[in-house]
Amino acid sequence: SRYRGRLKLPKETGDELLRVIVGRLNNSVSHEEASDALRTLATGLSPQAVSSTTFSALENLSRTIGCFSASLHFTERTHLAIEGEKSQVRLVLSAIHRRDLEQAIDHFRHYWTWDDDWFDIAHYIWIWSGGISGVKAFDIEPQWDALLRDKTVTILGPAETSLTKRSLKNESLVVRVIMQDVLAWDAHSDPLGGQCDLAYASRETRNWLRETNAWDQLEQFQVTSLRVDEGSELGSETASLRRAHDPRKLMLGGSSPNMIPLMAWDIMRVPGVTLTMGGTTFFASQEAYTAGNRRFKHTSGRATDETGSTGELFERCPTFARHNVLENLTLLANWVSEGAISADKPMTRVVALSPEAYMAELDTLYGIERR
C-alpha cells in the first residue's frame, strides 16, 4: 500500500503489480506471465491520468524483475505523458531518448534558455547535430584540457572488442574503468597491450580505494577521474585525481548514468577530441566482462563472473533498472549514428538495435534466468 500511494495507482493496479513482483521473485510467476501482466497494466493506464514520473517508476520496476521487453510499454507511455505536461526540458529529453534528432532540434530551438538545466542538453545536441544546433558548452579544466585537447582517445570497456593495438594511432590515449582487482591488464593477452593512460573509478571503487588506502596503485595513470558528487572530497591529496562530469541531467527517468556513457560525456566536454569506443555492449552479450576485467566486489567479499554478478538472485536486473540501460545506450547510440564518435564492431551492432531488439536480448540473457 505504501508504494501504491507513492505511485498514485488504483488499488486493483497496485495489487496486480505487487502480485507480479512477488511472484517473479519467488518464481511462482513465470517471466512470460509477468511480462504479459505488465503489458496489460501499462495498457490500462492513461497517459492523461498518470504522470510521466510514475510511468518511469513502473518502467524501472519492470526491469528490476527482468521484464525488459514489457518495460517498453511503460517507456512509451512516459513519452506520451510528457507531451501533456509543462516541462520544456523534459520535452527535449524525450526527443533525445526517442532518438529523434529533428524533434530535439526543434524543441531546443523553441524552448532553451540560459538556465542551468539546459547547458548539458545544449552541449549534447551540439555534438549530436554536428554543430548544427545546440550550444557548445565546454567546461575547461586547465590540466585536463592540456591532456586531451585535439587528441585521439580510445575508451575501452570490460566487454569483448574488435579493437587491437593496430587500431591505436600514434600518441592515442587509452581510457578504462578500474575496479578492485582490475587495475592493470596483461600486455600479451589484452587487445590493446595493457595500455591505460587515464582511469575512471565508480563510487564503489573509490570507496574501496579510500577504505584500504590503496591510492598508490593509481600512480601508473596520468589522471584518475572519480565519480563523486559535487562538494564531496576526492579522498587523497597525493594521487592525481579529478571529479568526472556526470551526465545525470541527460537522463529522463531520474536514473544514474553508467560509467561508460559518463566517461564519453566527460571526455567530449574537451574541445577537439576524436573519440573511439570499444569493449562495451551495454550488457547485450554473453560476456559483458572478459576474463581480465572481472572485479572482486569488496562490499560482498565475492568475485564476479562474466555478467558482473556474484551469483545472487536478481543481482544484475536491479542494477540495470537503476542505471536505466536503455537511456545509457541511447545517449551513445545517437552520437554513433551521426558520426560524432566511432565504435568497434560489437558496440556498433548493439547501438544499431531497436529498443525492442535490445530489450529482447536482455530478457534472454538476464530476465528469464532471474540474474
Segments predicted by a language model, with ranges:
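Metal-ion/cofactor- or nucleotide/acyl-coenzyme-handling active-site neighborhoods
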Residues: 1-371
